[in-house]
């Protein structure tokens, strides 16, 4: 495959992400995607067999940095709390730099109902939560944070906080970046969990 084929395919995926961000998952049709890409629907089929194939690639794009982020955080020689913060900051940075992709977090339910994306998005959600749970459990085991709440509860809370910030930003204008706002709230929240030594 030539470079132009790959780059055009990537532009189509980027346009699909933009359509989802601007108008929701239901607006992602071959017609809308072809219009946005200024191409015919027939030409679109040269790159993808249909919208479901595009959606699979969108989900792949959404989760493509997950493994690298986990490996980088695990390799750090730092406290468990710092690992949690670095993990969350990596996603906050990603969502700041590619804001349209963050809206996929608000589409989880719908993506779970589409047969072609169900397995991949379920895997992505589960892997992120399991990794966060482990980070929180390690922080509890080392006495860095309180064990008043379960690691699973904390992982779900911090994920819910991200979803809430993403949703709120779609409704209201914010002067601060997503990363600034989210990480500021995470720091305050983590301060409540920390055990002073």
Where are these regions (language model features)?
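N-terminal intrinsically disordered/low-complexity leader segments
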Residues: 1-7, 197
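Hydrophobic alpha-helical connector segments
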Residues: 57, 71-97, 151-158
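Generic hydrophobic, amphipathic alpha-helix propensity
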Residues: 8-17, 33, 58-62, 66, ...
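Amphipathic alpha-helical packing segments from all-alpha helical-bundle domains
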Residues: 67, 71-74, 97, 115-142, ...
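Hydrophobic/aromatic-rich alpha-helical bundle segments in the mid-to-C-terminal region
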Residues: 103-104, 140-187
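Amphipathic, non-transmembrane alpha-helical scaffold segments
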Residues: 9, 55, 59, 63, ...
